Amino acid sequence: MEKLKALIEVTKPKQTFLLMITFLVSYIVARGGADFNFVIAAISMFLAISGTTAINMWLDRDIDAIMPRTRKRPVPAGILKPSECAAFGAAIFAIGQVLAFLVSLEFGLVVFFGLFFDIVVYTILLKRKSPYSIVLGGFAGAMPALGGWVAVQGFTLPGFIIAAIVLLWIPSHIWYISMHYEEDYRMANIPMYPLVVGMERASWAIVFATAAMLVLAASLYVLLPLGIFYLVISTSAVAFFLYKAVKFALSPDRVKARKMYKLASMTLGLVYFSLLLGVFL
């Protein structure tokens, strides 16, 4: 039972759930509802995200063992062997990848590039070397949203915008939490952007990304037949977050950074919830 719990834990259920929300909503907006293809695509994406995350946990086991925040994870804690974590991640990703190509070639490519950007670009090449790691690695986090659209409509502009909203949100998600746990990242020698350039400069980078996110959220109202509820809720949520981000940037604080991290997740959730309202109301 402990092994099963550990296998579930290495997929980071909360993170996977949030990414699946972006996929599910994107698919429903593209289709106008759900169908049988939706079930196959959803299973595929869930397995792909979970597998990629487990592989990531395997690769990061050494730095996870250093940071107090992560040292109790299954692999550094010794509950799972590194080989078990790697094999589990690779197996479920492979199943997800096969299912993805059954949905469509385009969807299969999106799933593959999700793994590529997360594992190769972010974790292996950039995370331990560059403060700009999430700028390119962040593309992985946007792939589920893009995949939801591509599974239905292929590669068209609205899908890229829906994915770009997530991409622009990622700096707030990653950098705020790295500000709060600054000492952990220093101990593990991870050159996160806020640690290298300072909290103030990183905070203003988040402000600019959020401002662009607001523009893209509004543009979807023009491009897609979404109701007024979408426009009001999405732009209000992002505008409020932008206000709080500016306020934080004027006076950065490690304790408040955790609150901003949580607010960032709520903001993205509201944007995607408003997309659903826009389709059905």
Curated annotation (Swiss-Prot):
Gene3D superfamilies: UbiA prenyltransferase. It is a multi-pass membrane protein. It is found in: Cell membrane. Pathway: Porphyrin-containing compound metabolism; heme O biosynthesis; heme O from protoheme: step 1/1. GO terms for cellular component: plasma membrane. Keywords: Cell membrane, Heme biosynthesis, Membrane, Transferase, Transmembrane, Transmembrane helix. NCBIfam families: cyoE_ctaB. It catalyses: heme b + (2E,6E)-farnesyl diphosphate + H2O = Fe(II)-heme o + diphosphate. HAMAP family: CyoE_CtaB. Converts heme B (protoheme IX) to heme O by substitution of the vinyl group on carbon 2 of heme B porphyrin ring with a hydroxyethyl farnesyl side group. Carbon 2 of the heme B porphyrin ring is defined according to the Fischer nomenclature. It comes from the Archaea. The chain crosses the membrane at residues 16-36, 38-58, 75-95, 101-121, 129-149, 150-170, 202-224, 228-250, 261-281. This is Protoheme IX farnesyltransferase. PROSITE patterns: UBIA (PS00943). One of its GO terms (molecular function) is protoheme IX farnesyltransferase activity. Its EC number is 2.5.1.141. It comes from Archaeoglobus fulgidus (strain ATCC 49558 / DSM 4304 / JCM 9628 / NBRC 100126 / VC-16).
